[in-house]
Amino acid sequence: MPELPEIEIVKRSLYKMINKAKIINVKINNKNLRYKIPNTFSKNLTNERILNISRKSKYLIFHFKKKLLLAHFGMSGKLFIIRNRDKKIFKTSFYYNLNLDPKHNHIFFKLSNGLILIYNDVRRFGFFKFYNTPEISRINFLNKLGPEPLSRKFNVEFFKNNIKKRKKNIKNLLMDQKFVSGLGNIYVNEALFMSNIHPLKECYNLEKNQIRKITFNIKKVLRTSISKGGSSIKDFKNTHGKSGEFQQFFHVYGKENNNCSRISCKGKIKKIVISGRSTFYCSKCQN
């Protein structure tokens, strides 16, 4: 599933290429995404000009004069851009697949600048929701989210004040979108390794110095990933069809039985399952 850095990369790419463009028409090949696309979807977006593109957590938001379009990529959703006159650009690829199957191209947005924005989703867990309001505060999907991890609000004091009496391990807490929004399995694994914290450590047992480390390293790993173009494990591509490269810098994620990357550590990377998710940690330096 694309996480915060991947959605941020897509947002920046889209902003450069399609912001201020007008949607000429919308073609829908398959309405059956996570939430069925309504019959009024194309009509509501035709002739609307994109005034801004923003991100909150793992959601992408297209802003129009009096409307909003909320997008979530689910497990395998991708947005691609092609030039209307050059269909060859369309032949991009998945990370582990040389062919992007056009049967999974579900929505085509034809734009006034000669570009076509395509939504491709193999598993169809992603969705688009249209709102007749320009106010983000009216979007129910966003109202219950915790602060953005890269924001000033997500700091040591916030962390300390919001873990009191919580009977959760640190891995599950960081995955809770009501506590902090946008984090997913990859970056939580990496941030906990960088902080020398075992993923099963109970929140109420965290010392202030450990909280400081976790807060700092969450921000660090996210910024680093954004600078590297995001992570491409299986499905993520940016809008140009290019893979991110942060996966080359993973310390623990997907590294089961590898030696710890810390030179001074003789531990091995172990894999356990926490709340149904694969979790990776060093057996020695994350105790």
Labelled PLM ranges:
Residues 65-182, 187-194, 202, 209:
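Phosphate/anion-contacting hairpin/loop surfaces
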Residues 15, 22-41, 51, 61, ...:
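Basic, nucleic-acid-binding surfaces and adjacent catalytic neighborhoods in DNA/RNA-processing proteins
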Residues 2, 6, 151, 210:
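Catalytic cores of large soluble enzymes that bind and process phosphate-bearing ligands
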Residues 1-120, 125-126, 258, 262, ...:
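A cross-family signal for N-terminal binding/gating loops and helix N-caps
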